[in-house]
C-alpha cells in the first residue's frame, strides 16, 4: 500500500475513529454538544418529520387486495429481515425503514408470492445504503448467499429499479425510533416542569431502550402498525414504558404535553400559509383511553414475554449488550401489567401506609381507563416453509454457484391515484418486461449443480389456509 494512496488515508481515519470510540469521556462530551445544538431546532425537526410522515404512509386497503400476498405472511418476512439486520450489525433505523419500503411498494404494485423475499432483501439493501456505513452495506454476493441462492444477483438490481420507480424515488421516511429520540429530548429540555424533566433524564436510557423494543414488536402486528402512524406508535411506546416501569409521571399530563407542542407558536411558525400539513394533535386523549384497556394489557403481556425469535437474538442473547437490562425491564413490565389487571388485595393498615407514602412523595394517581373488547392477535404461526436461514459463514463463502430459477412475471405498474384513495387492482395495466434481462440468466452447467435447501421457491412465505 502506497503511503499517499486513498486506502492509506482511509486506514488512518478508521484507526482514529476506533480510538475515539473507545474514549467514553470524549463520547459523552460529543453527545452533550450534539444535544445542545439540536435543542435549538427541535420544533423544526418535529414539523419536518410529521410533514414527511403524512406523505409516506402505506395503504392497508390496497395491501389487502394483493392476490397472492397475505398479511399472515408478513411476520415471517419481518422475522427473517430482523435476523439479517442483527447479524450484520446494522443501525436501529434500518428495520422500520425497510418495513415502510415493503408496505409502500405493496400499496402500488402487485407482488408475486415467490418474489416476496426478494422484495424484502432489496428493501433492506436500499435502507442500508441510506442509513448505514459503507463498509456495512451488503454486496450483491452477500444478498444472494443470505437467501441461500434463491435469486440471481441481477434480480436484486432489477427489483431495486422497480422499487425506486414505484416510490418515485422517495426513500426516506420518518421511523418510530427517530420520534422516540425527539420526544425524549423535548421532554428533557422542557423548561416548564423541571421535576418531570429530571425524572425522565435519569431514566432516559431505559425509556429509549424499552420504547424501541415495543416499537419493533408492534411492526409484527398489522392492526397496530397500520392503525397508527410512526409518530403515534413512538408516543404509545413511551407511554407504555412510563406506565410499566413505574416512572412517577402522569400519563395524561405527558400526552397533553406532546399534543400541546403542535399548538405552540414556535411550531406553527414553520407551517406555511395555505399548506396542507396542519396538525391539531399527535394522539388524542380519546384514542389513548380506547387503546389502554384491560384487553390491550392482557395481549401486551403476551407480546412482551413472547417476542419473535429474531428479537430474542437481538435483545436476549447470552452475551448481548443489553441482555441483562432487557430481562429486568421485561420482568418489571410484565409484573406491573399483571398488577394492573389483578391488583393485590390490601388490608386497611396497608392502605393507610400507601396513602401516607403518596402524600409524602407527591404521588399523582393515574386516571381511570375505559374498557372495551378490542384485542391484539398473536403473531401468526406458519405451518409451511419458513424463510431460508443463513449463517455469517455462508455470506462470505467463496462458492459462487447459483441454482437456475425462473424470475416469473414482474409486478405491474399501478395507475396513479391520490394517497389513501381506494382502488382496485383490476384496473392496473400489465408491465411488459424485456426478455433480454431475463433470458441471459440461464446457467451453462445447470445439470452439474444442485438445488439448495428449498426445492420449490414458489412456496416461500406461503401460509396454508
From Swiss-Prot:
It comes from Candida albicans (strain SC5314 / ATCC MYA-2876) (Yeast). Induction: Repressed by farnesol. InterPro entries: Cyclin (IPR039361), Cyclin-like_dom (IPR013763), Cyclin-like_sf (IPR036915), Cyclin_CLN (IPR014399), Cyclin_N (IPR006671), Cyclins_cyclin-box (IPR048258). It comes from the Eukaryota. Interacts with CDC28 and SLA1. Keywords: Cell cycle, Cell division, Cyclin, Mitosis, Phosphoprotein. This is G1/S-specific cyclin CLN3. G1/S-specific cyclin essential for the control of the cell cycle at the G1/S (start) transition. CLN3 may be an upstream activator of the G1 cyclins which directly catalyze start. Required for budding and for cell cycle progression and morphogenesis in environment-induced hyphae. Degradation is mediated by GRR1. Through binding to CDC28, controls the phosphorylation of SLA1 which regulates cortical actin patch dynamics. GO terms for molecular function: cyclin-dependent protein serine/threonine kinase regulator activity; protein kinase activity. Residues 44-171 form the Cyclin N-terminal domain. Hyperphosphorylated. GRR1 preferentially mediates the degradation of hyperphosphorylated CLN3. One of its GO terms (biological process) is single-species biofilm formation. GO terms for cellular component: cyclin-dependent protein kinase holoenzyme complex; cytoplasm; nucleus. PANTHER family: CYCLINS. Belongs to the cyclin family.
